[in-house]
């Protein structure tokens, strides 16, 4: 059982960071809508880090990275099948959350720079990987509430890229250790966001 004080400390830190993320989107759209973007980014990071963790585990004895295995034409279908069997989806190495963050914060040149369209493609690739598999029922439409082409995120691709990029970087700062976390980050984040936005709506209503 998680230590109560540790849980509370983690929950408080998560609440502060989620509030900061919410402020990035505040004024762009209704609170009930932008929570979908925050939850969508958090969930994508969760799925991505599950992939990272699983691939590191199964490839350890082979002495290759996920990137190296995926780049090999013979190895790629093998790791894709492993991922589908174990996780129910495939996230390509270039679409891993950590690699998208690198393109936002440490891009090497203009061609390497992050675009909101990269994130949109990453999500489409993930959902597409489940087609024809049992897991498609769980993933089909899962990210539909996160409309990355919505003009309220920004009138131009550059504006939307800036907005989503800032949210993603803030989400990357959340303590998200899947092995050591004292509590359910996804579930706790959802409950905190519901509380934050209910409070926000109450203030507007009052």
Regions found by a protein language model. Name each.
Residues 1-206:
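Non-catalytic, mostly N-terminal accessory regions of nucleic-acid modification and defense proteins
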């Amino acid at each position: 059982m998680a230590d109560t004080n540790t849980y509370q400390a983690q929950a408080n830190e998560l609440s502060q960071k989620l509030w900061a993320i919410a402020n990035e989107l505040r004024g762009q759209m209704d609170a009930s809508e932008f929570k979908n973007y925050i939850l969508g980014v958090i969930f994508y990071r969760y799925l991505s880090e599950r992939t990272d963790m699983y691939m590191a585990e199964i490839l350890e004895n082979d002495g290759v990275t996920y990137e190296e295995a995926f780049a090999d034409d013979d190895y790629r279908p093998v790791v894709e099948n492993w991922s589908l069997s174990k996780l129910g989806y495939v996230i390509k190495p270039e679409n891993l959350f950590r690699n998208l963050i690198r393109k936002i914060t440490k891009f090497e040149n203009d061609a390497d720079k992050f675009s909101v369209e990269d994130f949109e493609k990453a999500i489409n690739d993930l959902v597409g990987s489940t087609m024809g598999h049992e897991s498609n029922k769980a993933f089909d439409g899962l990210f539909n509430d996160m409309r990355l082409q919505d003009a309220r995120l920004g009138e131009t691709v550059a504006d939307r890229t800036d907005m989503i990029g800032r949210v993603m970087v803030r989400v990357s700062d959340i303590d998200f250790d899947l092995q050591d976390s004292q509590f359910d980050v996804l579930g706790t984040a959802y409950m905190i966001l519901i509380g934050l936005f209910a409070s926000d709506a109450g203030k507007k209503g009052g």
